[in-house]
Swiss-Prot record:
Name this protein carries in UniProt: Cytochrome b
Note: Heme 1 (or BL or b562) is low-potential and absorbs at about 562 nm, and heme 2 (or BH or b566) is high-potential and absorbs at about 566 nm.
Entries under Pfam families matching the protein: Cytochrom_B_C, Cytochrome_B
Subcellular location: Mitochondrion inner membrane
Coiled-coil boundaries: none
Note describing how the cofactor binds: Binds 2 heme b groups non-covalently.
Organism: Python molurus (Indian python)
Family under the similarity heading: Belongs to the cytochrome b family.
GO biological process assignments: mitochondrial electron transport, ubiquinol to cytochrome c
Length: 371
Protein backbone atom coordinates (compact mmCIF):
# COMPACT_ATOMS: atom_id res chain seq x y z
CA UNK A 1 0.00 0.00 0.00
CA UNK A 2 1.47 3.41 -1.01
CA UNK A 3 2.22 6.07 1.64
CA UNK A 4 -0.50 8.45 0.47
CA UNK A 5 -3.01 5.63 0.49
CA UNK A 6 -6.08 7.83 1.16
CA UNK A 7 -5.35 10.02 -1.88
CA UNK A 8 -4.54 6.92 -3.91
CA UNK A 9 -7.78 5.34 -2.72
CA UNK A 10 -9.82 8.24 -4.14
CA UNK A 11 -7.63 8.56 -7.23
CA UNK A 12 -7.78 4.91 -8.18
CA UNK A 13 -11.38 4.39 -7.11
CA UNK A 14 -12.91 2.37 -9.99
CA UNK A 15 -16.00 4.13 -11.34
CA UNK A 16 -18.31 3.22 -14.25
CA UNK A 17 -17.29 4.91 -17.51
CA UNK A 18 -20.78 6.03 -18.44
CA UNK A 19 -21.97 7.90 -15.31
CA UNK A 20 -23.44 11.23 -16.40
CA UNK A 21 -23.39 14.71 -14.88
CA UNK A 22 -26.33 13.71 -12.64
CA UNK A 23 -23.74 11.86 -10.53
CA UNK A 24 -21.89 15.13 -9.79
CA UNK A 25 -24.29 16.30 -7.11
CA UNK A 26 -22.85 14.09 -4.36
CA UNK A 27 -19.52 15.92 -4.45
CA UNK A 28 -21.36 19.26 -4.73
CA UNK A 29 -23.27 18.40 -1.55
CA UNK A 30 -19.97 17.71 0.18
CA UNK A 31 -18.72 21.16 -0.90
CA UNK A 32 -21.97 22.76 0.36
CA UNK A 33 -21.54 21.03 3.72
CA UNK A 34 -17.95 22.29 4.04
CA UNK A 35 -19.06 25.84 3.14
CA UNK A 36 -21.96 25.76 5.63
CA UNK A 37 -19.77 24.54 8.51
CA UNK A 38 -17.10 27.15 7.74
CA UNK A 39 -19.44 30.15 7.34
CA UNK A 40 -21.62 28.90 10.21
CA UNK A 41 -18.65 28.85 12.58
CA UNK A 42 -17.73 32.48 11.81
CA UNK A 43 -21.38 33.54 12.23
CA UNK A 44 -21.69 31.65 15.55
CA UNK A 45 -18.64 33.55 16.85
CA UNK A 46 -20.59 36.84 16.57
CA UNK A 47 -24.15 35.59 17.17
CA UNK A 48 -25.97 36.01 20.51
CA UNK A 49 -28.65 33.42 21.35
CA UNK A 50 -30.94 35.75 23.28
CA UNK A 51 -34.39 36.90 22.17
CA UNK A 52 -33.55 40.55 22.91
CA UNK A 53 -30.17 40.51 21.17
CA UNK A 54 -30.41 37.86 18.38
CA UNK A 55 -31.91 40.18 15.74
CA UNK A 56 -29.46 42.98 16.66
CA UNK A 57 -26.52 40.55 16.49
CA UNK A 58 -27.47 39.62 12.89
CA UNK A 59 -27.53 43.35 12.01
CA UNK A 60 -24.17 43.75 13.78
CA UNK A 61 -22.72 40.86 11.71
CA UNK A 62 -23.91 42.33 8.39
CA UNK A 63 -22.89 45.94 9.19
CA UNK A 64 -19.87 45.90 11.49
CA UNK A 65 -18.07 42.54 11.15
CA UNK A 66 -15.50 42.54 8.29
CA UNK A 67 -17.05 40.50 5.44
CA UNK A 68 -19.91 39.62 7.80
CA UNK A 69 -22.46 40.45 5.09
CA UNK A 70 -20.72 37.92 2.83
CA UNK A 71 -20.62 35.21 5.51
CA UNK A 72 -24.28 35.74 6.35
CA UNK A 73 -25.43 35.72 2.71
CA UNK A 74 -23.21 32.76 1.79
CA UNK A 75 -24.64 30.81 4.73
CA UNK A 76 -28.26 31.63 3.83
CA UNK A 77 -27.85 31.07 0.07
CA UNK A 78 -25.59 28.05 0.73
CA UNK A 79 -28.56 26.42 2.52
CA UNK A 80 -30.72 26.94 -0.58
CA UNK A 81 -27.98 25.50 -2.81
CA UNK A 82 -27.66 22.56 -0.42
CA UNK A 83 -31.35 21.75 -0.84
CA UNK A 84 -31.32 22.28 -4.64
CA UNK A 85 -28.43 19.79 -4.86
CA UNK A 86 -30.00 17.27 -2.46
CA UNK A 87 -33.37 17.31 -4.25
CA UNK A 88 -31.64 16.73 -7.61
CA UNK A 89 -29.48 14.02 -5.97
CA UNK A 90 -32.62 12.22 -4.67
CA UNK A 91 -34.43 12.66 -8.02
CA UNK A 92 -31.45 11.05 -9.79
CA UNK A 93 -31.55 8.19 -7.26
CA UNK A 94 -35.27 7.68 -7.99
CA UNK A 95 -34.84 7.83 -11.77
CA UNK A 96 -31.81 5.55 -12.05
CA UNK A 97 -32.78 3.04 -9.34
CA UNK A 98 -29.92 3.94 -6.98
CA UNK A 99 -32.29 3.10 -4.10
CA UNK A 100 -31.67 -0.62 -4.73
CA UNK A 101 -28.41 -0.10 -2.84
CA UNK A 102 -30.59 -0.21 0.29
CA UNK A 103 -28.09 0.72 3.02
CA UNK A 104 -26.86 3.76 1.07
CA UNK A 105 -30.44 4.89 0.33
CA UNK A 106 -31.56 4.51 3.96
CA UNK A 107 -28.54 6.44 5.26
CA UNK A 108 -29.20 9.12 2.60
CA UNK A 109 -32.85 9.64 3.63
CA UNK A 110 -31.79 9.78 7.30
CA UNK A 111 -29.29 12.46 6.24
CA UNK A 112 -32.10 14.38 4.49
CA UNK A 113 -34.24 14.34 7.67
CA UNK A 114 -31.28 15.53 9.79
CA UNK A 115 -30.52 18.27 7.24
CA UNK A 116 -34.15 19.45 7.26
CA UNK A 117 -34.11 19.61 11.07
CA UNK A 118 -30.83 21.57 11.01
CA UNK A 119 -32.16 24.04 8.42
CA UNK A 120 -35.39 24.52 10.40
CA UNK A 121 -33.47 25.32 13.61
CA UNK A 122 -31.24 27.70 11.64
CA UNK A 123 -34.24 29.57 10.19
CA UNK A 124 -35.41 30.42 13.72
CA UNK A 125 -32.07 31.93 14.83
CA UNK A 126 -32.32 35.44 13.24
CA UNK A 127 -35.45 35.92 15.41
CA UNK A 128 -37.22 37.84 12.68
CA UNK A 129 -41.00 37.95 12.39
CA UNK A 130 -41.26 35.00 9.97
CA UNK A 131 -38.63 33.01 11.92
CA UNK A 132 -40.69 33.31 15.10
CA UNK A 133 -44.07 32.50 13.55
CA UNK A 134 -42.79 29.64 11.36
CA UNK A 135 -41.23 28.12 14.50
CA UNK A 136 -44.50 28.59 16.42
CA UNK A 137 -46.65 26.98 13.71
CA UNK A 138 -44.34 24.02 12.96
CA UNK A 139 -43.45 23.13 16.57
CA UNK A 140 -47.13 23.50 17.50
CA UNK A 141 -47.85 20.48 15.27
CA UNK A 142 -46.45 18.32 18.08
CA UNK A 143 -49.65 19.07 20.02
CA UNK A 144 -51.45 16.88 17.45
CA UNK A 145 -49.72 13.80 18.94
CA UNK A 146 -52.36 12.00 21.06
CA UNK A 147 -51.84 12.06 24.87
CA UNK A 148 -48.21 13.23 24.74
CA UNK A 149 -48.58 16.24 22.40
CA UNK A 150 -48.84 19.10 24.89
CA UNK A 151 -46.08 17.67 27.11
CA UNK A 152 -43.77 17.21 24.10
CA UNK A 153 -44.38 20.78 22.90
CA UNK A 154 -43.75 22.27 26.36
CA UNK A 155 -40.57 20.19 26.63
CA UNK A 156 -39.33 21.35 23.21
CA UNK A 157 -40.14 25.02 23.93
CA UNK A 158 -38.67 24.93 27.43
CA UNK A 159 -41.80 26.67 28.69
CA UNK A 160 -45.42 27.40 27.79
CA UNK A 161 -44.52 29.55 24.77
CA UNK A 162 -41.60 30.08 22.42
CA UNK A 163 -39.14 32.14 24.42
CA UNK A 164 -35.47 32.52 25.37
CA UNK A 165 -34.92 28.83 26.30
CA UNK A 166 -36.34 27.82 22.89
CA UNK A 167 -33.88 30.03 21.01
CA UNK A 168 -30.94 28.80 23.13
CA UNK A 169 -31.70 25.12 22.51
CA UNK A 170 -32.37 25.70 18.81
CA UNK A 171 -28.96 27.38 18.51
CA UNK A 172 -27.31 24.47 20.37
CA UNK A 173 -29.04 21.95 18.06
CA UNK A 174 -28.21 23.98 14.94
CA UNK A 175 -24.55 23.99 15.99
CA UNK A 176 -24.28 20.28 16.89
CA UNK A 177 -26.35 18.64 14.12
CA UNK A 178 -23.91 19.49 11.26
CA UNK A 179 -21.31 17.33 13.02
CA UNK A 180 -23.82 14.47 13.02
CA UNK A 181 -24.36 15.17 9.29
CA UNK A 182 -20.58 14.97 8.66
CA UNK A 183 -20.42 11.58 10.45
CA UNK A 184 -23.48 10.26 8.60
CA UNK A 185 -22.10 11.54 5.27
CA UNK A 186 -18.90 9.55 5.87
CA UNK A 187 -21.02 6.45 6.56
CA UNK A 188 -23.11 7.18 3.43
CA UNK A 189 -19.94 7.36 1.26
CA UNK A 190 -18.46 4.19 2.83
CA UNK A 191 -21.71 2.27 2.21
CA UNK A 192 -21.87 3.58 -1.36
CA UNK A 193 -18.35 2.47 -2.25
CA UNK A 194 -18.92 -0.99 -0.81
CA UNK A 195 -21.10 -1.76 -3.83
CA UNK A 196 -20.11 1.14 -6.10
CA UNK A 197 -22.21 3.72 -7.94
CA UNK A 198 -25.03 2.71 -10.25
CA UNK A 199 -25.01 4.00 -13.83
CA UNK A 200 -27.52 5.29 -16.42
CA UNK A 201 -27.97 1.83 -17.99
CA UNK A 202 -28.44 0.06 -14.66
CA UNK A 203 -26.05 -2.69 -15.77
CA UNK A 204 -23.15 -4.22 -13.86
CA UNK A 205 -20.28 -1.81 -14.59
CA UNK A 206 -17.48 -4.17 -13.45
CA UNK A 207 -16.41 -4.90 -17.04
CA UNK A 208 -15.95 -1.21 -17.90
CA UNK A 209 -14.50 0.94 -15.10
CA UNK A 210 -12.00 3.80 -15.08
CA UNK A 211 -10.13 5.57 -12.23
CA UNK A 212 -12.07 8.35 -10.51
CA UNK A 213 -9.12 10.73 -10.99
CA UNK A 214 -8.64 12.43 -13.42
CA UNK A 215 -11.67 11.40 -15.49
CA UNK A 216 -14.54 12.04 -13.08
CA UNK A 217 -12.78 14.42 -10.68
CA UNK A 218 -12.42 17.08 -13.42
CA UNK A 219 -16.06 16.66 -14.39
CA UNK A 220 -17.03 17.16 -10.72
CA UNK A 221 -14.74 20.19 -10.53
CA UNK A 222 -16.48 21.82 -13.51
CA UNK A 223 -19.92 21.59 -11.90
CA UNK A 224 -18.49 22.68 -8.56
CA UNK A 225 -17.02 25.79 -10.21
CA UNK A 226 -20.37 26.56 -11.87
CA UNK A 227 -22.19 26.16 -8.54
CA UNK A 228 -19.75 28.50 -6.74
CA UNK A 229 -20.06 31.03 -9.60
CA UNK A 230 -23.87 30.85 -9.39
CA UNK A 231 -23.72 31.35 -5.61
CA UNK A 232 -21.35 34.32 -5.85
CA UNK A 233 -23.59 35.97 -8.48
CA UNK A 234 -26.61 35.63 -6.14
CA UNK A 235 -24.61 36.84 -3.10
CA UNK A 236 -23.31 39.86 -5.02
CA UNK A 237 -26.39 40.95 -6.99
CA UNK A 238 -29.53 39.30 -5.50
CA UNK A 239 -28.65 38.52 -1.84
CA UNK A 240 -32.26 38.71 -0.62
CA UNK A 241 -33.86 36.63 -3.38
CA UNK A 242 -34.66 33.71 -1.03
CA UNK A 243 -35.51 35.88 2.01
CA UNK A 244 -38.99 36.66 3.27
CA UNK A 245 -39.74 40.42 3.61
CA UNK A 246 -41.34 39.78 7.04
CA UNK A 247 -38.03 38.48 8.37
CA UNK A 248 -36.50 41.96 8.15
CA UNK A 249 -38.67 42.93 11.14
CA UNK A 250 -37.86 41.79 14.67
CA UNK A 251 -40.09 39.00 16.05
CA UNK A 252 -43.28 40.33 17.59
CA UNK A 253 -45.49 37.72 19.32
CA UNK A 254 -48.42 40.22 19.31
CA UNK A 255 -48.54 40.67 15.50
CA UNK A 256 -49.24 37.70 13.24
CA UNK A 257 -47.94 37.92 9.65
CA UNK A 258 -50.61 37.85 6.95
CA UNK A 259 -49.26 34.62 5.49
CA UNK A 260 -46.97 32.36 7.56
CA UNK A 261 -44.63 30.18 5.52
CA UNK A 262 -41.24 28.49 6.02
CA UNK A 263 -38.23 28.67 3.68
CA UNK A 264 -38.86 27.63 0.04
CA UNK A 265 -37.18 24.21 0.46
CA UNK A 266 -39.84 23.12 3.00
CA UNK A 267 -42.78 24.45 1.01
CA UNK A 268 -43.61 21.11 -0.69
CA UNK A 269 -44.05 19.46 2.75
CA UNK A 270 -45.82 22.56 4.11
CA UNK A 271 -48.17 22.51 1.09
CA UNK A 272 -49.05 18.87 1.84
CA UNK A 273 -49.63 19.80 5.50
CA UNK A 274 -51.96 22.68 4.56
CA UNK A 275 -53.92 20.66 2.00
CA UNK A 276 -55.48 18.52 4.76
CA UNK A 277 -58.01 20.44 6.91
CA UNK A 278 -57.35 18.24 9.96
CA UNK A 279 -54.41 19.00 12.29
CA UNK A 280 -53.39 15.39 13.04
CA UNK A 281 -54.01 14.31 9.42
CA UNK A 282 -51.90 17.20 8.13
CA UNK A 283 -49.07 16.45 10.56
CA UNK A 284 -49.10 12.75 9.53
CA UNK A 285 -49.08 13.69 5.82
CA UNK A 286 -46.15 16.06 6.46
CA UNK A 287 -44.13 13.27 8.13
CA UNK A 288 -45.16 10.71 5.50
CA UNK A 289 -44.07 13.00 2.62
CA UNK A 290 -40.47 12.29 3.72
CA UNK A 291 -40.83 8.89 5.40
CA UNK A 292 -42.39 7.37 2.27
CA UNK A 293 -38.94 7.54 0.65
CA UNK A 294 -37.83 4.76 3.03
CA UNK A 295 -40.21 2.22 1.43
CA UNK A 296 -39.07 2.72 -2.19
CA UNK A 297 -36.34 0.00 -2.21
CA UNK A 298 -38.95 -2.55 -1.06
CA UNK A 299 -41.59 -1.67 -3.68
CA UNK A 300 -39.35 -2.00 -6.77
CA UNK A 301 -40.95 -4.68 -8.98
CA UNK A 302 -39.48 -3.83 -12.43
CA UNK A 303 -36.77 -6.07 -13.87
CA UNK A 304 -34.93 -3.03 -15.23
CA UNK A 305 -33.14 -1.01 -12.55
CA UNK A 306 -33.32 2.53 -14.03
CA UNK A 307 -36.29 4.22 -15.70
CA UNK A 308 -34.18 4.62 -18.87
CA UNK A 309 -36.14 1.82 -20.59
CA UNK A 310 -39.45 2.21 -18.71
CA UNK A 311 -41.72 4.78 -20.43
CA UNK A 312 -44.65 4.57 -17.97
CA UNK A 313 -42.37 5.09 -14.97
CA UNK A 314 -40.71 8.01 -16.77
CA UNK A 315 -44.12 9.62 -17.24
CA UNK A 316 -44.89 9.18 -13.53
CA UNK A 317 -41.44 10.48 -12.55
CA UNK A 318 -41.80 13.72 -14.52
CA UNK A 319 -45.34 14.07 -13.12
CA UNK A 320 -43.75 13.87 -9.65
CA UNK A 321 -41.21 16.59 -10.56
CA UNK A 322 -43.92 18.93 -11.88
CA UNK A 323 -46.08 18.09 -8.83
CA UNK A 324 -43.18 18.99 -6.52
CA UNK A 325 -42.72 22.37 -8.25
CA UNK A 326 -46.48 23.11 -8.32
CA UNK A 327 -47.03 22.26 -4.64
CA UNK A 328 -44.03 24.46 -3.71
CA UNK A 329 -45.57 27.35 -5.66
CA UNK A 330 -49.09 26.78 -4.23
CA UNK A 331 -47.71 26.76 -0.66
CA UNK A 332 -46.47 30.35 -1.13
CA UNK A 333 -50.06 31.49 -1.73
CA UNK A 334 -52.78 32.28 0.85
CA UNK A 335 -55.19 29.53 1.97
CA UNK A 336 -58.02 30.41 -0.42
CA UNK A 337 -59.46 29.12 -3.72
CA UNK A 338 -58.06 28.08 -6.16
CA UNK A 339 -54.86 27.38 -4.18
CA UNK A 340 -56.61 25.00 -1.75
CA UNK A 341 -57.75 22.65 -4.53
CA UNK A 342 -54.37 22.93 -6.33
CA UNK A 343 -52.59 21.91 -3.10
CA UNK A 344 -54.99 18.99 -2.54
CA UNK A 345 -54.65 17.67 -6.11
CA UNK A 346 -50.84 17.98 -6.12
CA UNK A 347 -50.55 16.39 -2.63
CA UNK A 348 -52.63 13.44 -3.87
CA UNK A 349 -50.51 13.13 -7.04
CA UNK A 350 -47.33 13.21 -4.92
CA UNK A 351 -48.40 10.14 -2.94
CA UNK A 352 -49.88 8.40 -6.02
CA UNK A 353 -46.37 8.27 -7.53
CA UNK A 354 -45.04 6.13 -4.67
CA UNK A 355 -48.16 3.93 -4.53
CA UNK A 356 -48.27 3.31 -8.31
CA UNK A 357 -44.58 2.45 -8.81
CA UNK A 358 -44.87 -1.31 -7.97
CA UNK A 359 -47.95 -1.62 -10.22
CA UNK A 360 -46.19 0.15 -13.10
CA UNK A 361 -43.18 -2.16 -12.63
CA UNK A 362 -45.40 -5.24 -13.16
CA UNK A 363 -47.09 -3.66 -16.22
CA UNK A 364 -43.70 -2.79 -17.76
CA UNK A 365 -42.44 -6.32 -17.15
CA UNK A 366 -45.41 -7.56 -19.22
CA UNK A 367 -44.76 -4.93 -21.91
CA UNK A 368 -41.11 -5.99 -22.27
CA UNK A 369 -41.98 -9.70 -21.95
CA UNK A 370 -39.47 -10.21 -19.12
CA UNK A 371 -40.43 -13.15 -16.88
Amino acid sequence: MPHHYILTLFGLLPVATNISTWWNFGSMLLACLALQVLTGFFLAVHYTANINLAFSSIIHITRDVPYGWMMQNLHAIGASMFFICIYIHIARGLYYGSYLNKETWMSGITLLITLMATAFFGYVLPWGQMSFWAATVITNLLTAVPYLGTTLTTWLWGGFAINDPTLTRFFALHFILPFAIISMSSLHIILLHEEGSSNPLGTNPDIDKIPFHPYHSYKDLLFLTLMILFMLIIVSFFPDIFNDPDNFSKANPLVTPQHIKPEWYFLFAYGILRSIPNKLGGALALVMSIMILFIIPFTHTAHFRPMTFRPLSQLMFWTLVSTFITITWAATKPVEPPYIIISQVTATLYFIFFISMPLLGWIENKMTNTP
